């Protein structure tokens, strides 16, 4: 139940709030798409992963490809290169 509520909340953000501002995510997949995948893979712990990702998404990082890891982690996915661009 909680998982579905979180997914609906993120999808509502993607549909109604995100289009109001220019694209600014430095990662691929976007932070909201990352949050959805993290919640689907890791349940409610995925919200922590999504928040950690949002906190990493700022102008002082290179960004790049950063998929959701298979195991729960609040760190950037170590299987991808920091210099890998999308």
Swiss-Prot record:
Annotated PANTHER family: MEMBRANE PROTEIN INSERTION EFFICIENCY FACTOR-RELATED
Entries under Pfam families matching the protein: YidD
Organism: Streptococcus pyogenes serotype M18 (strain MGAS8232)
GO cellular component, one term: plasma membrane
Subcellular location: Cell membrane
InterPro entries: Membr_insert_effic_factor_YidD
Name of the protein in its database record: Putative membrane protein insertion efficiency factor
Sorted UniProt keywords: Cell membrane, Membrane
HAMAP family: UPF0161_YidD
Biological function: Could be involved in insertion of integral membrane proteins into the membrane.
UniProt record similarity statement: Belongs to the UPF0161 family.
Top-level taxon in the UniProt lineage: Bacteria
Mode of membrane association: Peripheral membrane protein
């Amino acid at each position: 139940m909680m998982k579905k509520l979180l997914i609906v909340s993120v999808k509502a953000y993607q549909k109604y709030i995100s289009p109001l501002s220019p694209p600014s995510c430095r990662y691929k997949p976007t932070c909201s798409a990352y949050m959805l995948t993290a919640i689907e893979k890791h349940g409610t712990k995925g919200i922590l992963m999504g928040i950690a990702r949002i906190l990493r998404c700022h102008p002082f990082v290179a960004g790049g490809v950063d998929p959701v890891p298979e195991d729960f982690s609040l760190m950037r996915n170590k299987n991808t290169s920091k210099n890998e661009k999308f």
